[in-house]
């Protein structure tokens, strides 16, 4: 039997995805050489931050903790010791793909989710999918 996901779990996962995306960008930004790629990444960081602020305004009770932050930061630093823009674009694409899959899975399991929260989750998916498309030329 599949357990129903509650609203707090969905908010937590949404914030976790946004935070992980922003942390990854923060660690990679100074390693990007291509100016166009840098602008795409900066724009993505802003979109994630704006959506995170909307979530916090709508759900001020939401706990904002990033799961596995240390592991993410360590992995990024290790993978970018010897890297180039194509590898960075690949890492960001893979992270965005994982976020889309996770959010889709969660939403498919929940039928009675608050419509505002569903809208934010859909926004997160849309932002991530657009970002993936923009990154393709750098792979």
Regions found by a protein language model. Name each.
Residues 1, 27-28, 49-50, 72-78, ...:
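Short hydrophobic/aromatic-rich motifs at helix boundaries and adjacent loops
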Residues 2-32, 86-111:
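Alpha-helical bundle segments that constitute or directly flank the non-heme di-iron/ferroxidase center
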Residues 12, 38-46, 90-93, 117-126:
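Short, charged, amphipathic alpha-helical segments
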Residues 13, 17-20, 24-28, 36, ...:
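Non-catalytic alpha-helical scaffold/packing segments enriched in small hydrophobic residues
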Residues 34-35, 114:
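Short loop-to-helix capping motifs
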Residues 38-70, 135-139:
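Conserved alpha-helical segments that form or flank metal/cofactor-binding pockets of metalloenzymes
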Residues 53, 95-139:
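Preference for long, well-ordered alpha-helical segments
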Residues 53-101:
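Carboxylate-rich helix-loop segments that flank metal/cofactor sites and access channels
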């Amino acid at each position: 039997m599949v357990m129903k996901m509650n609203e707090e779990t969905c908010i937590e996962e949404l914030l976790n995805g946004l935070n992980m995306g922003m942390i990854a960008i923060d660690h990679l930004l100074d390693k990007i050489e291509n100016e166009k790629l840098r602008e795409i990444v900066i724009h993505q960081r802003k979109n994630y931050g704006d959506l995170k602020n909307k979530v916090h305004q709508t759900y001020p009770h939401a706990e904002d903790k990033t799961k596995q932050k240390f592991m993410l930061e360590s992995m990024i630093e290790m993978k970018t010791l010897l890297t180039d823009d194509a590898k960075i674009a690949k890492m960001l694409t893979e992270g965005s793909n994982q976020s889309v899959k996770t959010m889709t899975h969660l939403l498919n399991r929940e039928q009675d989710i608050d419509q505002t929260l569903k809208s934010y989750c859909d926004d997160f998916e849309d932002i991530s999918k657009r970002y993936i498309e923009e990154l393709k030329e750098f792979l």
